[in-house]
């Protein structure tokens, strides 16, 4: 519970502008890990220079952060949130589990810059995401997806 609270303490600036922060997260993900852009067919033709102002990237980034907010606010009681998410990411989107590790580090960096996430908060976010990723992976295995 302490890790969830430590991250939520810094969540206000993220929640205040999901579109902007979400765009920053995905743009940085695609910039630092260009192969990840291929996982999003609807973003395939968007050049790096055009991402910052792209409404579709902002909207999807906001969706990612809103789902993370649900997980954070559930404070560990997130099975009902993760199961459908794992199902769609395994069966429809085919997203390998390692990509969640990549986006975790991007979210840590963006929250450090835009929400003042301190060292303790960064560790807490990595811990929360570690549990989330392990639970996603367990669901993937149940579905027979070795992402």
Curated annotation (Swiss-Prot):
Its EC number is 1.7.-.-, 1.11.1.-. The keyword Cytoplasm applies. It is found in: Cytoplasm, Sarcoplasm. It comes from the Eukaryota. GO terms for biological process: removal of superoxide radicals. GO terms for cellular component: extracellular exosome; sarcoplasm. Residues 2-141 form the Globin domain. GO terms for molecular function: heme binding; metal ion binding; nitrite reductase activity; oxygen binding; oxygen carrier activity; peroxidase activity. Belongs to the globin family. Monomeric heme protein which primary function is to store oxygen and facilitate its diffusion within muscle tissues. Reversibly binds oxygen through a pentacoordinated heme iron and enables its timely and efficient release as needed during periods of heightened demand. Depending on the oxidative conditions of tissues and cells, and in addition to its ability to bind oxygen, it also has a nitrite reductase activity whereby it regulates the production of bioactive nitric oxide. This is Myoglobin. It comes from Scomber japonicus. The lineage of its organism: Eukaryota, Metazoa, Chordata, Craniata, Vertebrata. The gene is mb.
């Amino acid at each position: 519970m302490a890790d969830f609270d430590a991250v939520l303490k810094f969540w206000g600036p993220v929640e205040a502008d999901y579109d902007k922060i979400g765009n920053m997260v995905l743009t940085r993900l695609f910039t630092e890990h260009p192969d990840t852009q291929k996982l999003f067919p609807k973003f395939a033709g968007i050049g790096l220079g055009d991402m910052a102002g792209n409404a579709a990237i902002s909207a999807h980034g906001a969706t990612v952060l809103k789902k993370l907010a649900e997980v954070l606010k559930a404070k560990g009681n997130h099975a009902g949130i993760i199961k459908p998410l794992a199902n769609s990411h395994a069966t429809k989107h085919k997203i390998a589990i390692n990509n969640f590790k990549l986006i975790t580090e991007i979210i840590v960096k963006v929250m450090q810059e835009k929400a003042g996430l301190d060292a303790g908060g960064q560790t807490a976010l990595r811990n929360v995401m570690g549990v989330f990723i392990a639970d996603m992976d367990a669901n993937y295995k149940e579905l027979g997806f070795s992402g």
